[in-house]
Amino acid sequence: IFNKEDQNELLNKHFAKSININTIDISENFIKKYPNFIKKTLTDLIQATKYFKYKEVEIKDKLYYIFYNVIFETNKNLLQKCLKRLSFVAIGTIADNMPIINENRIILKVGLKEIALRERMSINYLLKDANILTKPNITSTDIAYKIAPILNSTGRLEKADIAINFLLTNDINQIENKFKEIKEINELRKYKEEKAWNSHNKNTIFKNDKFIVCYDNNTPKGISSRIATRLSSYYQKVAIFLTKQDNIIKGSIRSNNKINSKTLISIIPSHLVINSGGHKAAAGFTLHENLLEDFIKELEYATTKVEYETTNENESIPIDAILPKNLTKDSLFKTIEIFEPYGYEFREPILLMKNV
């Protein structure tokens, strides 16, 4: 907060002192550097900021701008510390399948350069295991297919702390021991995933020409999204995979670009769903086990109401560029590298060379 006395008074007034609130006052160091702002409120800072005079900005964005600049103005070395950790952020961005647009592109690009410096022993260990330690440039594709899956396996089996401890340590013995654990967890993940896949036919509870729904109460919830993705790809349908933990059912939707997954869940009455979230391509939700039968009925109804995109066989392929015949392979690769990193919502270019 900024200006603790005033802000705490407002918080106590709002919550009627019903809860204990601990705050950190970021104004103290700022005022030492800029004494003219003593006794100033956040409103005063917003009014004094010229940036807001030339564009319409929502109040939440104004507050973010103020707090961001106050923190970095009084902690000049903080940004450098953050930059040294962007290798982790880059891996996390890809591993969590975040859209590679806007700020994410900048963070990922800088993070990949940080990885290429080979300064993190744990990350180097991952690169070595993937046979890319000596590769000059590490790409988003390298992370997506060779690094992210093995790290993600720990979270899928609810043992993410092992991956965190592995990444953060600089002790070579701990790195070796933790990585051995991670490899074992990944093998277990593969086994459980294959077991769930092999039994999906008997666990299919609803299927038509557009949708398939499976319920397997023995599959770990962290694997449900993987099975949903495989189902969607294999059947070329919208896939929904359900699993159970402690009387709570967790569902994963993969749309195969046929529907808006988030819209599908929104059609189902809210009293049947505990939590839900996602985007067009994928969504997740939870519900109580005793409501499963009602949920399936409503889900079947929702599949008839959600807008479904059919594939047009004559649909044209969007071409990003037409290549000249005299373009060398090295020039082509260099051009493609310029637009790195690629990933979700920022695909590799589709190129055309005529009359080859």
Descriptions of predicted regions:
Residues 35-45, 229, 332-334:
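Short, surface-exposed amphipathic charged segments that create phosphate/polyanion-binding patches used
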Residues 97, 305-356:
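A contiguous loop/helix-start segment that scaffolds small-molecule binding in enzyme catalytic cores
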Residues 10-14, 212, 227-230, 331, ...:
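A short acidic, amphipathic alpha-helical/loop segment
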Residues 63, 152, 336:
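A residue-level signal for conserved active-site and pocket-lining positions in enzyme catalytic cores
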Residues 75-297, 308, 318, 322-325:
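Hydrophobic helix-and-loop "lid/oligomerization" segment in the mid-to-C-terminal part
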Residues 4, 10-11, 42-82, 91, ...:
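Acidic, Mg2+-coordinating catalytic module of metal-dependent nucleases/exonucleases
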Residues 1-35, 56, 60-67:
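Conserved DEDDh/DEDDy metal-dependent 3′-5′ exonuclease domain
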Residues 35-39, 57-60, 64, 105-108, ...:
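Amphipathic alpha-helical transducer elements in NTP-driven molecular machines
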